[in-house]
Amino acid sequence: MKLKSILLLLLLTTGILCTQCDKNTSNFQQIEKQTDAIYSSLVKIRRDLHVNPELSKQEKRTSQIVADYLRNLGLEVKTNIGGNGVVGILKGGKKGRNIAWRADMDAIKTDDPDVVDFKSQNKGIRHICGHDVHTTIALGIANVLSQQKENLEGTVYFIFQPAEETFTGAKDMIADGLFDIIQPDEIYGLHIGPEASGVINVKANELFAYQKTLQVKFKPNTNKKELESFMNAIVKGLVRTIEQNGSPWDIINKISDSKVGLTNKETIFKDYFILQGGRLTTEKEDTFYNASFLETDIKRVNSLPFEIKKQILDSKFKDSFISIEYAKDYSGTPLNDPELTKIASQTIASFYTKKMLAPLYGQAPYFGEDFLYYQQKVPGVFFFLGGSNVEKGIVSMPHTPNFAVDETTIKYGVQSFAALILERANSK
């Protein structure tokens, strides 16, 4: 009798799982068709945004395009949040989970010439971080999900953020009452990365290394030459794992290297300390030693000031020492919720080609993302979406002079993440 009960339970469970799997597949197939139907219009939007890039806190034209597009879809729209921020609210036909999706809108100052035919018309400004693509993908997701309204349970919030490049936009929107307007249970977002177009990368916890500047204050009458030499020796002794030969770009170029990069289990980017520079400065009557570095381990980040202070107090400079502290952060790393990362990965894998979902095993250096400020309020996951196409000569490494994105990435982004949001909104 017990065996029969177990077999019956297994059959019922299998049936439920298969039904859910079939539902996921059906929804995704419908989303694929809807995305295909709007793809050419999305490419036009992306190219228009690329031709007319706007710097941080100047995204008026972009935010107007976004707001008009969302209104035409029938969404409730809020504007001028934290500056040029826009929020679109899509309410489903039934009650369910509330899911937020965030995209950034600003461009970057650069004198490097554009590498695409639809070149920037704003001199010295380009979208070389892919925010034009991020914005377009988010609009595409909003379009597709508005067509799925009868299948949507819960509410989806679309956050279009200004000033990501200055690391102020998220904080500005939050300070201006963003979370009074929206009440998400989960939040998601993405950034274009150097993998092949459509490849999704994700990992739990930190995506990037922590970028910190340590400031040590000394009395003014200290022997500056000896002090700088002493402090340089301390911080150089902290360096580990990654070779310091070459420029930062030499290290960054290894990120997508299949042998040592982030998608390899034996990646060199798992555990490291990279010293970006250390120097002595004098301000008024005080002497400061400033050291900037990248560190993967938050415990090490927290313990370093105490370790360095101990070495100073054990040295001949102990009587000159005044204080040690971290300077204000202008960068940081998203901190992906482990449980949501697992669930989101499994959900995407249920309808997306398996080889297109590649886990990460390390933390990228030299990058920052203010998406982390949303994650301090709501559990969430931040993804990388590959945009490169080697055969076409397209390399989507952010902030590089030849940055470009294969526009099929827009289609992949809309399809996969619209399906993810739908499944998460409808989840119990």
Where are these regions (language model features)?
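Divalent metal-coordination and catalytic microenvironments
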Residues: 49, 70, 88, 101, ...
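Acidic/His- and Gly-rich active-site-bordering loop/insert found
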Residues: 22-127, 136, 148-152
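Sec-dependent N-terminal signal peptides
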Residues: 6-14
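Positively charged n-region of N-terminal signal peptides that target proteins for export
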Residues: 1-5
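Active-site-adjacent substrate-binding region
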Residues: 236-270, 331-387
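Midchain, well-structured core segments that form catalytic/ion-binding scaffolds
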Residues: 184-313, 322-333
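His/Asp/Glu-rich mid-to-C-terminal helical/loop segments that flank catalytic regions of hydrolases
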Residues: 225-244, 385-428
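Acidic/histidine-rich catalytic neighborhood of metal-dependent amide-processing enzymes
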Residues: 133-206
